[in-house]
């Protein structure tokens, strides 16, 4: 079961938290549960449109009666904010037009993008779109995650790999990735690479160690005050120009799925 289910949804309330936090019991049009779900999908689609280079990791949405708070986690906050905050103002105005409510937009920087599964998947997909060999791209993403402190990494690519006539799936794994262990802190990301041969799906699992319920509650309690009142400002600084050093590829576990 742990091999098939989404690792994030499988661990809700144990090591992960909901990315949409609101309650709806109204029967009025525009305030029903289905209306909020559709609106959340539209918000996330709007956040990904035109910000492909920003390295967006995840979008968290929280609603009150007359306000919507959107937390945008990104590896490059400067691209999202824009010159003198022009891009952030544009995003906020589009969100207010979409929701019809006051929107609080918080732009938060991902401190360690090499350990973020979604960003690693995006990086591999960008390399595949640039015609880099898929095995080389997979190994490079795994090496960067291992150097950043990951205890285990698994990367899987599915599609017409290398331009082959028949599609297949291949994966590489280093370290431990215990998908059945609920207390295991496993980050999961998926992204599609658009190549000349068609789309190639990239899945990434990163194991960061075990987490107890007490540690999870402490992490949630410390994250709430940091996000409050920091609209349109990145959290922390990071040298975007520094490139990771190249290292020799270690021995890895490989596999092929028909």
From Swiss-Prot:
Residues 43-111 form the KH type-2 domain. Gene3D superfamilies: 3.30.300.20, Ribosomal protein S3, C-terminal domain (3.30.1140.32). GO terms for cellular component: cytosolic small ribosomal subunit. Transmembrane segments: none annotated. Keywords: Ribonucleoprotein, Ribosomal protein, RNA-binding, rRNA-binding. Residues 242-258 have a biased composition (Low complexity). Coiled coil: none annotated. Residues 229-241 have a biased composition (Basic and acidic residues). The lineage of its organism: Bacteria, Bacillati, Actinomycetota, Actinomycetes, Micrococcales. Residues 217-258 are annotated as: Disordered. Part of the 30S ribosomal subunit. Forms a tight complex with proteins S10 and S14. GO terms for molecular function: mRNA binding; rRNA binding; structural constituent of ribosome. GO terms for biological process: translation. Binds the lower part of the 30S subunit head. Binds mRNA in the 70S ribosome, positioning it for translation. The gene is rpsC. Signal peptide: none annotated. This is Small ribosomal subunit protein uS3. The keyword rRNA-binding applies. Belongs to the universal ribosomal protein uS3 family.
């Amino acid at each position: 079961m742990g091999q098939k289910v989404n690792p994030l949804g499988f661990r809700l309330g144990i090591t992960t938290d909901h990315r949409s936090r609101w309650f709806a019991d109204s029967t009025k049009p525009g305030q029903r549960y289905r209306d909020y779900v559709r609106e959340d999908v539209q918000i996330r689609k709007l956040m990904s449109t035109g910000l492909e280079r920003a390295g967006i990791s995840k979008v968290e949405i929280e609603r009150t009666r007359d306000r919507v708070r959107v937390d945008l986690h990104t590896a490059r906050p400067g691209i999202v904010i824009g010159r003198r905050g022009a891009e952030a103002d544009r995003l906020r105005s589009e969100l207010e037009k979409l929701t019809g409510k006051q929107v609080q937009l918080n732009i938060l920087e991902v401190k360690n993008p090499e350990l973020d599964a979604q960003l690693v998947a995006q990086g591999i997909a960008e390399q595949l779109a640039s015609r880099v060999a898929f095995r080389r791209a997979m190994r490079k993403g795994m090496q960067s995650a291992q150097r950043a402190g990951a205890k285990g990494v698994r990367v899987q690519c599915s599609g017409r790999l290398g331009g082959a006539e028949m599609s297949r799936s291949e994966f590489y794994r280093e370290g431990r990735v215990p998908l059945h262990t609920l207390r295991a802190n496993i980050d999961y990301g998926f992204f599609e690479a658009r190549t000349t041969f068609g789309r190639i799906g990239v899945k990434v699992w990163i194991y960061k160690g075990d987490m107890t319920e007490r540690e999870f509650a402490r992490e949630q309690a410390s994250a709430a005050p940091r996000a409050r009142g920091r609209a349109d400002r990145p959290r922390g600084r990071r040298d975007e120009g520094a490139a990771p050093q190249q290292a020799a590829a270690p021995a890895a576990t490989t596999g092929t799925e028909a």
